[in-house]
Amino acid sequence: MPLLNDLLDFSDHPLMPPPSAQLFAEHLPTEWIQHCLTLSAHATVRRRRLPGDMVIWMVVQNEPITDVVRRLNLSADGEAGMNLLARSAVTQARQRVGAAPVEWLFRQTAQDRGAERYLKDDWHGLQLFAIDGAQFRTPDKPELREYYGSANTSTKRQNAYPVMRLVALMNLGSHILLNAVTAPYRQSETVLAHSMLATIPDNSITLFDKLFYSEDLLLTLNQKGCNRHWLLPAWKNIASEMIELGNTASPGTIPKRLEHLRGALEVVFITKRPRPSRPRSVKISKTRYPVKHSAAPLK
């Protein structure tokens, strides 16, 4: 029996989210939850205390799953005491569901909601996106260290934890992720960003960090789409060519323009410092430094 049939046999309303997840229920259709559970490779005929749909909703929650389970008292009969779920039950439930349903739910949400336009969500008619990378530490396990690797230190020893590299594409208007890619630490962020260029919509401008300065990446973004542009900070001493200069004032007219901007504030500015007619002298305060005329002269 598939996992979905087991969930339908669990209760009359198996796909209703927990009370604290009503915010997500307003935006995620229950049909998506039902479809993503069919992607799970696990099949069972047991009546689970923590069904798959509950696990999906808890993954969507922006808080630790153990806290959600303890606070909501998720169990088959909703009773407290001996029927509370153990800590290991939450981990086992996530392992039963697997990564495929959660990944499909993310891709479906990004495809359906990621490119939506909102009021004032444009810059000269272009939609704003951004690509950036980050690094995360993973649990120190041999299989994770072998796959992700870790950063080197000043000594021969490696970092204490394996490091995972993440590159994500975000809609700057709604802060919804359109795409995200994870890879080992040694893999370049530019290569990961190149794999998500097809996700960027047309009539858009994408912001990059200066570390993404790659000719292949930027030309592919501009040429493979329709009216797609990019923007990133310029490197120091970068070789450039001036194509067209905007309406700027001539350098020779800058002093006159500054005098015009001063207007009635001429009294604030010192245009010319008057030169004294006699040499400047340093005077000594007689009260603070009294002079003793009877003192012997300095040699």
Curated annotation (Swiss-Prot):
Region annotated Disordered sits at 276-299
| Protein name in UniProt | Putative transposase InsZ
Where does the record place Basic residues bias?
276-291
Biological process terms from the Gene Ontology for this record are: DNA transposition
Give the transmembrane ranges. none
Which domain of life does the UniProt lineage start with? Answer: Bacteria
What else is noted? Could be the product of a pseudogene; missing an internal segment of about 130 residues compared to orthologs.
Query: Record's InterPro entries?
Result: RNaseH-like_sf (IPR012337), Transpos_IS4 (IPR047952), Transposase_11 (IPR002559), Transposases_IS4_N (IPR024473)
Give the Pfam families listed for this entry: DDE_Tnp_1, Nterm_IS4
What GO molecular function annotations does the UniProt record carry, in alphabetical order? Answer: DNA binding; transposase activity
